[in-house]
Amino acid sequence: MKLYKIYSRAIGLLFALSLLCVGCENEDILDINDLEISPSNPESVVIVEPDDGITSVNALTKAINENGDATYILRRDGVYYMEGKNVFKHNVVIKAENGSGKMPIIQPICDAQGALNADMIRLEGSATFENIYIIGKDAATGNLMQRLFRIDESNVRLKFDNCFIDHCRNFCIRTDNVNNKIYLNNSTIRNLALTSDPANGRLIDSRGNEQDSIVINNCYVYNNTAHIVRFDNVVTNYFGIKHSTFYNVGHHIQINYAIKVEIENNIFANVGWKSSAESDVFWQISIPKKDERAQDISTLDSQLKFMIK
């Protein structure tokens, strides 16, 4: 009888182990490419109703201040006005609602005195924009914003996916701190221009702050009077331009001190038409000779020069 019980238990143990092995055999194992920075409270979804620009403005900013880290759904055909100083202090995803209709619009509007803030949105937390039309032209006067997005903190992740970004005078994205990640994906960016001072009209300006990653993928960028990216002589860990078209961009392509660069399958047309201190400058590539991270940068530099001859 005791032998029977022991035998039965042994069979049960073997069966349990076999199930455990089968259960683990086909399990998917995550790697770093599967991970994505999300709001700390991603299950929180907030629907934000549009502004009318008269009795209501800053509905999106108010919703973020009230609800914190979350996904914010904007109504299609709606406009969300930004008046005065708008600071996003939380990690947010801002996206259009599902269904038909025009993209939700985020647009600045001047105050009662006609004053327009220099920055449309300032970021202290990470932000992702999906299927949003962002226009930097004052809804009341038609005046252009100086800057659309200004990153105030370090380690911020800013991503645009399937967005349309239109109009500003100085730059679309400015960083005032280090180690940020900026991604532009499947988006159109146009009319970043100041004709009275063509040195302005930049897509991204690091303002001399080291960045982690700057990526432009499958985008259409046109009618910019200045640089696509202004690094300002600092190190960037990764800089990528892939599957994108650039047309009518005033300045040459500047790559300062990037540790890893990938430029693949792009079209550059009428780029670098603004006069330069050097003749026939299309690419400007700087090598961080004293940076210990730049082990293969000389090879990379040679490859880039070969590619663009």
Where are these regions (language model features)?
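Bacterial N-terminal signal peptides that target proteins for export
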Residues: 2-11
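Bacterial Sec-dependent N-terminal signal peptides
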Residues: 3, 17-47
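Acidic Gly/Asp/Thr-rich repetitive segments characteristic of extracellular carbohydrate-active
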Residues: 34-81
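Extracellular beta-strand-rich solenoid/capping regions of secreted or surface-exposed proteins
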Residues: 65, 80-95, 105-156, 175-176
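Acidic glycine-/aspartate-rich tracts in secreted/extracellular proteins
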Residues: 77-78, 98-101, 273
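Right-handed parallel beta-helix
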Residues: 91, 125-136, 156-169, 179-195, ...
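Structural detector of coil-to-beta-strand junctions
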Residues: 118-120, 140-141, 145-150, 171-172, ...
